[in-house]
Amino acid sequence: MSKDKDIKVTPGTCELVEQILALLSRYLSSYIHVLNKFISHLRRVATLRFERTTLIKFVKKLRFYNDCVLSYNASEFINEGKNELDPEADSFDKVILPIASMFVKCVETFDLLNYYLTQSLQKEILSKTLNEDLTLTAESILAIDDTYNHFVKFSQWMIESLRIGSNLLDLEVVQFAIKCADEDGTNIGETDNIFLQEILPVNSEEEFQTLSAAWHSILDGKLSALDEEFDVVATKWHDKFGKLKN
Protein backbone atom coordinates (compact mmCIF):
# COMPACT_ATOMS: atom_id res chain seq x y z
CA MET A 1 0.00 0.00 0.00
CA SER A 2 1.37 3.41 -0.89
CA LYS A 3 2.41 5.57 2.04
CA ASP A 4 0.13 8.47 1.16
CA LYS A 5 -2.87 6.21 1.55
CA ASP A 6 -1.64 4.16 4.49
CA ILE A 7 -4.29 2.81 6.85
CA LYS A 8 -3.11 2.96 10.45
CA VAL A 9 -3.71 0.60 13.34
CA THR A 10 -6.63 1.92 15.39
CA PRO A 11 -9.19 0.38 17.75
CA GLY A 12 -11.54 0.32 14.77
CA THR A 13 -9.17 -1.65 12.54
CA CYS A 14 -8.38 -4.02 15.41
CA GLU A 15 -12.07 -4.72 15.88
CA LEU A 16 -12.29 -5.37 12.15
CA VAL A 17 -9.41 -7.84 12.38
CA GLU A 18 -11.16 -9.67 15.21
CA GLN A 19 -14.27 -10.04 13.05
CA ILE A 20 -12.19 -11.38 10.15
CA LEU A 21 -10.43 -13.89 12.38
CA ALA A 22 -13.73 -14.96 13.93
CA LEU A 23 -14.92 -16.02 10.48
CA LEU A 24 -11.80 -18.08 9.90
CA SER A 25 -12.11 -19.68 13.33
CA ARG A 26 -15.72 -20.55 12.61
CA TYR A 27 -14.72 -22.11 9.28
CA LEU A 28 -12.05 -24.22 10.97
CA SER A 29 -14.35 -25.19 13.83
CA SER A 30 -17.07 -26.38 11.45
CA TYR A 31 -14.69 -28.88 9.90
CA ILE A 32 -13.19 -29.95 13.21
CA HIS A 33 -16.66 -30.65 14.60
CA VAL A 34 -17.99 -32.69 11.68
CA LEU A 35 -14.73 -34.56 11.08
CA ASN A 36 -14.56 -35.62 14.71
CA LYS A 37 -18.00 -37.17 14.31
CA PHE A 38 -16.93 -38.84 11.08
CA ILE A 39 -13.74 -40.20 12.64
CA SER A 40 -15.78 -41.67 15.50
CA HIS A 41 -17.97 -43.59 13.04
CA LEU A 42 -14.95 -44.77 11.05
CA ARG A 43 -13.70 -46.66 14.11
CA ARG A 44 -16.32 -49.27 13.29
CA VAL A 45 -14.94 -49.91 9.79
CA ALA A 46 -11.63 -51.77 9.89
CA THR A 47 -11.09 -51.44 6.15
CA LEU A 48 -11.01 -47.65 6.48
CA ARG A 49 -8.47 -47.45 9.31
CA PHE A 50 -5.83 -45.74 7.16
CA GLU A 51 -8.34 -43.20 5.89
CA ARG A 52 -9.34 -42.53 9.49
CA THR A 53 -5.71 -41.91 10.42
CA THR A 54 -5.39 -39.40 7.58
CA LEU A 55 -8.45 -37.50 8.77
CA ILE A 56 -7.09 -37.43 12.32
CA LYS A 57 -3.95 -35.77 10.98
CA PHE A 58 -6.05 -33.16 9.19
CA VAL A 59 -8.08 -32.46 12.32
CA LYS A 60 -4.93 -31.97 14.38
CA LYS A 61 -3.69 -29.49 11.80
CA LEU A 62 -6.98 -27.57 11.72
CA ARG A 63 -7.10 -27.48 15.51
CA PHE A 64 -3.57 -26.04 15.59
CA TYR A 65 -4.57 -23.38 13.07
CA ASN A 66 -7.63 -22.51 15.13
CA ASP A 67 -5.59 -22.19 18.31
CA CYS A 68 -3.23 -19.80 16.50
CA VAL A 69 -6.14 -17.72 15.22
CA LEU A 70 -7.78 -17.49 18.63
CA SER A 71 -4.56 -16.43 20.33
CA TYR A 72 -3.77 -13.60 17.88
CA ASN A 73 -4.24 -10.19 19.49
CA ALA A 74 -4.29 -7.31 17.01
CA SER A 75 -4.65 -4.71 19.77
CA GLU A 76 -1.01 -5.31 20.71
CA PHE A 77 -0.10 -3.18 17.69
CA ILE A 78 -1.94 -0.10 18.93
CA ASN A 79 0.56 2.54 20.02
CA GLU A 80 -0.62 4.25 23.18
CA GLY A 81 -1.03 8.00 22.81
CA LYS A 82 -1.04 7.90 19.01
CA ASN A 83 -3.92 8.25 16.58
CA GLU A 84 -4.27 7.11 12.98
CA LEU A 85 -3.03 10.49 11.68
CA ASP A 86 0.23 10.21 13.62
CA PRO A 87 3.04 9.32 11.16
CA GLU A 88 4.61 7.11 13.84
CA ALA A 89 1.49 4.99 14.28
CA ASP A 90 1.86 1.44 12.98
CA SER A 91 0.57 0.70 9.51
CA PHE A 92 -2.41 -1.64 9.18
CA ASP A 93 -0.19 -3.77 6.93
CA LYS A 94 1.73 -4.84 10.03
CA VAL A 95 -1.44 -6.38 11.45
CA ILE A 96 -3.03 -7.71 8.27
CA LEU A 97 0.04 -9.42 6.77
CA PRO A 98 0.18 -12.28 9.30
CA ILE A 99 -3.60 -12.64 8.99
CA ALA A 100 -3.36 -12.82 5.21
CA SER A 101 -0.61 -15.41 5.58
CA MET A 102 -2.80 -17.47 7.91
CA PHE A 103 -5.74 -17.28 5.51
CA VAL A 104 -3.51 -18.49 2.67
CA LYS A 105 -2.20 -21.32 4.84
CA CYS A 106 -5.70 -22.37 5.83
CA VAL A 107 -7.34 -22.23 2.41
CA GLU A 108 -4.46 -24.16 0.85
CA THR A 109 -4.95 -26.83 3.52
CA PHE A 110 -8.70 -26.83 2.87
CA ASP A 111 -7.92 -27.32 -0.82
CA LEU A 112 -6.10 -30.57 -0.02
CA LEU A 113 -8.63 -31.67 2.58
CA ASN A 114 -11.63 -30.96 0.37
CA TYR A 115 -10.14 -32.95 -2.50
CA TYR A 116 -9.46 -35.88 -0.21
CA LEU A 117 -12.79 -35.65 1.59
CA THR A 118 -15.09 -35.11 -1.40
CA GLN A 119 -13.35 -37.21 -4.04
CA SER A 120 -10.68 -39.74 -3.04
CA LEU A 121 -12.27 -40.74 0.25
CA GLN A 122 -15.75 -41.04 -1.25
CA LYS A 123 -14.43 -43.56 -3.78
CA GLU A 124 -12.61 -45.51 -1.08
CA ILE A 125 -15.73 -45.68 1.08
CA LEU A 126 -17.84 -47.00 -1.77
CA SER A 127 -15.26 -49.57 -2.85
CA LYS A 128 -14.49 -50.83 0.66
CA THR A 129 -17.94 -50.76 2.28
CA LEU A 130 -20.11 -51.30 -0.84
CA ASN A 131 -22.69 -48.82 0.48
CA GLU A 132 -23.24 -45.09 0.92
CA ASP A 133 -23.84 -45.04 4.67
CA LEU A 134 -20.69 -43.01 5.36
CA THR A 135 -20.58 -40.90 2.21
CA LEU A 136 -21.23 -37.19 1.91
CA THR A 137 -24.41 -35.90 0.33
CA ALA A 138 -24.25 -34.14 -3.02
CA GLU A 139 -25.57 -30.99 -1.33
CA SER A 140 -22.82 -31.04 1.29
CA ILE A 141 -20.14 -31.34 -1.39
CA LEU A 142 -21.60 -28.33 -3.22
CA ALA A 143 -21.61 -26.34 0.04
CA ILE A 144 -18.01 -27.35 0.73
CA ASP A 145 -16.89 -26.15 -2.69
CA ASP A 146 -18.94 -22.95 -2.57
CA THR A 147 -17.69 -21.97 0.87
CA TYR A 148 -14.10 -22.71 -0.09
CA ASN A 149 -14.35 -20.63 -3.27
CA HIS A 150 -15.64 -17.62 -1.36
CA PHE A 151 -12.98 -17.87 1.35
CA VAL A 152 -10.34 -18.02 -1.38
CA LYS A 153 -11.81 -14.93 -3.01
CA PHE A 154 -11.98 -13.10 0.31
CA SER A 155 -8.32 -13.94 0.95
CA GLN A 156 -7.47 -12.66 -2.52
CA TRP A 157 -9.49 -9.49 -1.91
CA MET A 158 -7.90 -8.85 1.48
CA ILE A 159 -4.42 -9.06 -0.03
CA GLU A 160 -5.00 -7.22 -3.30
CA SER A 161 -7.29 -4.48 -2.00
CA LEU A 162 -4.59 -3.42 0.47
CA ARG A 163 -1.83 -3.83 -2.14
CA ILE A 164 0.22 -6.16 0.01
CA GLY A 165 0.51 -8.85 -2.64
CA SER A 166 3.56 -11.09 -2.86
CA ASN A 167 4.34 -14.34 -4.62
CA LEU A 168 4.54 -15.81 -1.11
CA LEU A 169 0.85 -14.94 -0.68
CA ASP A 170 -0.26 -16.33 -4.03
CA LEU A 171 -3.03 -18.94 -3.99
CA GLU A 172 -2.57 -21.91 -6.30
CA VAL A 173 -6.19 -22.09 -7.41
CA VAL A 174 -6.17 -18.39 -8.35
CA GLN A 175 -2.87 -18.63 -10.21
CA PHE A 176 -4.13 -21.69 -12.08
CA ALA A 177 -7.30 -19.85 -13.09
CA ILE A 178 -5.25 -16.90 -14.35
CA LYS A 179 -2.94 -19.22 -16.29
CA CYS A 180 -5.87 -21.01 -17.94
CA ALA A 181 -7.52 -17.69 -18.81
CA ASP A 182 -4.32 -16.45 -20.44
CA GLU A 183 -3.91 -19.65 -22.43
CA ASP A 184 -7.54 -19.67 -23.53
CA GLY A 185 -7.66 -15.97 -24.30
CA THR A 186 -10.54 -15.52 -21.86
CA ASN A 187 -11.95 -12.01 -21.51
CA ILE A 188 -11.68 -11.52 -17.76
CA GLY A 189 -14.31 -8.79 -17.88
CA GLU A 190 -16.87 -11.25 -19.18
CA THR A 191 -16.04 -14.39 -17.19
CA ASP A 192 -18.12 -15.68 -14.30
CA ASN A 193 -15.07 -17.32 -12.71
CA ILE A 194 -15.00 -15.86 -9.19
CA PHE A 195 -11.20 -16.06 -9.03
CA LEU A 196 -10.83 -13.83 -12.10
CA GLN A 197 -13.16 -11.06 -11.00
CA GLU A 198 -11.36 -7.73 -10.67
CA ILE A 199 -10.34 -6.43 -7.25
CA LEU A 200 -9.93 -2.69 -6.76
CA PRO A 201 -7.61 -1.20 -4.13
CA VAL A 202 -9.10 0.55 -1.11
CA ASN A 203 -7.94 4.02 -0.10
CA SER A 204 -9.20 4.46 3.44
CA GLU A 205 -10.09 2.65 6.63
CA GLU A 206 -13.76 3.48 6.08
CA GLU A 207 -13.75 1.91 2.62
CA PHE A 208 -12.02 -1.22 3.88
CA GLN A 209 -14.48 -1.49 6.77
CA THR A 210 -17.47 -1.10 4.45
CA LEU A 211 -16.28 -3.76 2.04
CA SER A 212 -15.21 -6.05 4.88
CA ALA A 213 -18.69 -5.80 6.35
CA ALA A 214 -20.14 -6.86 2.99
CA TRP A 215 -17.74 -9.78 2.83
CA HIS A 216 -18.56 -10.70 6.43
CA SER A 217 -22.24 -10.96 5.52
CA ILE A 218 -21.47 -13.14 2.49
CA LEU A 219 -19.15 -15.50 4.34
CA ASP A 220 -21.49 -15.69 7.32
CA GLY A 221 -24.21 -16.90 4.96
CA LYS A 222 -21.90 -19.43 3.32
CA LEU A 223 -20.83 -20.80 6.70
CA SER A 224 -24.44 -21.07 7.86
CA ALA A 225 -25.30 -23.04 4.72
CA LEU A 226 -22.24 -25.25 5.21
CA ASP A 227 -23.15 -25.93 8.84
CA GLU A 228 -26.67 -26.90 7.81
CA GLU A 229 -25.35 -29.41 5.28
CA PHE A 230 -22.83 -30.76 7.79
CA ASP A 231 -25.67 -31.26 10.28
CA VAL A 232 -27.68 -33.14 7.65
CA VAL A 233 -24.81 -35.44 6.75
CA ALA A 234 -23.88 -36.01 10.41
CA THR A 235 -27.48 -37.01 11.12
CA LYS A 236 -27.34 -39.37 8.14
CA TRP A 237 -24.20 -41.01 9.49
CA HIS A 238 -25.76 -41.39 12.92
CA ASP A 239 -29.03 -42.81 11.60
CA LYS A 240 -27.26 -45.25 9.30
CA PHE A 241 -24.27 -46.12 11.40
CA GLY A 242 -24.17 -44.49 14.81
CA LYS A 243 -26.97 -46.55 16.31
CA LEU A 244 -25.08 -49.79 15.75
CA LYS A 245 -23.66 -51.35 18.87
CA ASN A 246 -19.95 -51.84 19.23
From Swiss-Prot:
InterPro entries: RNA-bd_She2, She2_dom_sf
Compartment(s) of residence: Cytoplasm; Nucleus
Principal location listed in the UniProt entry: cytoplasm
Documented effect of changing C68Y: Prevents dimerization and RNA-binding
Keyword Transport appears in the UniProt entry: yes
Stated consequence of mutating R63 to A/K: Prevents association with ASH1 and IST2 mRNAs and leads to their mislocalization
GO BP: intracellular mRNA localization; mating type switching; mRNA transport
Outcome reported for the amino acid change (mutating N36S): Prevents association with ASH1 and IST2 mRNAs and leads to their mislocalization
SUPFAM superfamilies assigned: RNA-binding protein She2p
GO terms under cellular component: cellular bud tip; cytoplasm; cytosol; nucleus
Superkingdom: Eukaryota
Similarity-based family: Belongs to the SHE2 family.
Additional record remark: Present with 4070 molecules/cell in log phase SD medium.
Protein name: SWI5-dependent HO expression protein 2
